[in-house]
């Protein structure tokens, strides 16, 4: 009996020592043995409600914990998540956190890529000579990388140089435009002096209305031609019939222009007869040679007309002369714009 009791005590002590050593390994060999033979480890003893004879009544049983390496634990966790049924949902916190982290990392990589591409494109637009000049040599070749700060500084300086170049070019063009405006002003001064000398006898209180079948735009072209032709030719007055003067245009559709001795004639530089007539006290007409040239030009303009309309033209002094927008051709509008610009200056 005593031998049996001694053997049982020794086995219980050895098992307790083995269990403590296996539960809390202190060496690498014991840890590897536990990891290798963990599937054949003894199961913990079931709890007895009445208590064990070897343990005191007030003591709690020892809780054992298996040792598992970190890599194996992560593998088992992933396998358990993948082996779940489709209806069951995995742990939401860890999965959502990993997806949000992946999306954030992807956005950050995309942002960095766009920034790098933008700086590379900006560097391609800057000439290498400008880079060499602004970096003062520095041993940087065309394929050397420049920092983002240096790239921005070089780009700003390059833009400033381009702006200075544009300003210089605009300054030269402005000088040319000023010269053109000066020449135009001189021409307008000459034309205005000639028109003022030819309209000294005009009356501001009376206006004469003429019926004319020629449209406005050929009439204005005719006036310009007359100004150019009779600019330096003197005007000669010839006495005609005291009752009525009629001048018929060779083209049958050109109509007839007549003036009466009872009306005070008021003409302006825009009138079709002001450059070939001179008025004194009676009714006069220009030199026959000038009148023939004038009628030839009227005939030529009349042949170019496609439509004929009856227009009642009102001839006013040069200071009050205005045309409607619909009566002006593009060339006439340009001339009027130049005249208004000169008057404003």
Curated annotation (Swiss-Prot):
Keywords: Developmental protein, Differentiation, Neurogenesis. GO terms for cellular component: RNA polymerase II transcription regulator complex; transcription regulator complex. One of its GO terms (molecular function) is DNA-binding transcription factor binding. The keyword Ligase does not apply. Residues 78-92 have a biased composition (Low complexity). Residues 99-162 form the bHLH domain. L(1)SC, SC and AC strongly label the presumptive stomatogastric nervous system, while ASE is more prominent in the presumptive procephalic lobe. Associates with the somatic nuclei through nuclear cycles 9 and 10. During nuclear cycle 11 distributes uniformly in the embryo. GO terms for biological process: central nervous system development; chaeta development; chaeta morphogenesis; enteroendocrine cell differentiation; Malpighian tubule tip cell differentiation; negative regulation of apoptotic process; nervous system development; neuroblast fate determination. InterPro entries: bHLH_dom, HLH_DNA-bd_sf, MASH1/Ascl1a-like. PROSITE patterns: BHLH. Residues 78-109 are annotated as: Disordered. SMART domains: HLH. PANTHER family: ACHAETE-SCUTE FAMILY BHLH TRANSCRIPTION FACTOR 1, ACHAETE-SCUTE TRANSCRIPTION FACTOR-RELATED. AS-C proteins are involved in the determination of the neuronal precursors in the peripheral nervous system and the central nervous system. Also involved in sex determination and dosage compensation. Efficient DNA binding requires dimerization with another bHLH protein. Interacts with da (via bHLH motif). Interacts with Bap60. This is Achaete-scute complex protein T4.
């Amino acid at each position: 009996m005593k031998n049996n009791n001694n053997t049982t005590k020794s086995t219980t002590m050895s098992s307790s020592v083995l269990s403590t050593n296996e539960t809390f390994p202190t060496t690498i060999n014991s840890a590897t043995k536990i990891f290798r033979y963990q599937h054949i480890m003894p199961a913990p003893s079931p709890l007895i409600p009445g208590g064990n004879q070897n343990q005191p009544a007030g003591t709690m049983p020892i809780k054992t914990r298996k040792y598992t390496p970190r890599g194996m634990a992560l593998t088992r966790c992933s396998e358990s998540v993948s082996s779940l049924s489709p209806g069951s949902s995995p742990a939401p916190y860890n999965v959502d956190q990993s997806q949000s982290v992946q999306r954030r990392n992807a956005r950050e990589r995309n942002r960095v890529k766009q920034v790098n591409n933008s700086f590379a494109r900006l560097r391609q637009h800057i000439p290498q000579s400008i880079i060499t000049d602004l970096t003062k040599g520095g041993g940087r070749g065309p394929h050397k990388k420049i920092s983002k700060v240096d790239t921005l500084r070089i780009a700003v300086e390059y833009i400033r140089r381009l702006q200075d170049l544009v300003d210089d070019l605009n300054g030269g063009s402005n000088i040319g435009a000023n010269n053109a405006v000066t020449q135009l002003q001189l021409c307008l001064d000459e034309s205005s002096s000639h028109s003022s000398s030819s309209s000294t006898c005009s009356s501001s209180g009376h206006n004469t209305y003429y019926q004319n079948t020629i449209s406005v735009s050929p009439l204005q072209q005719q006036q310009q031609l007359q100004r150019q032709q009779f600019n330096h030719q003197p005007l000669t007055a010839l006495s005609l019939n005291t009752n009525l003067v009629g001048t018929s245009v060779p083209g049958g559709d050109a109509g007839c222009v007549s003036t009466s001795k009872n009306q005070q004639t008021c003409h302006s530089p825009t009138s079709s007869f002001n450059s070939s007539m001179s008025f004194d006290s009676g009714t006069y007409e220009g030199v026959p040679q000038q009148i023939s040239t004038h009628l030839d030009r009227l005939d030529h303009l009349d042949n170019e007309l496609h439509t004929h309309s009856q227009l009642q033209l009102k001839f006013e002094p040069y200071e009050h002369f205005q045309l409607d927008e619909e009566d002006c051709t593009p060339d006439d509008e340009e001339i009027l714009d130049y005249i208004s610009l000169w008057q404003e200056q």
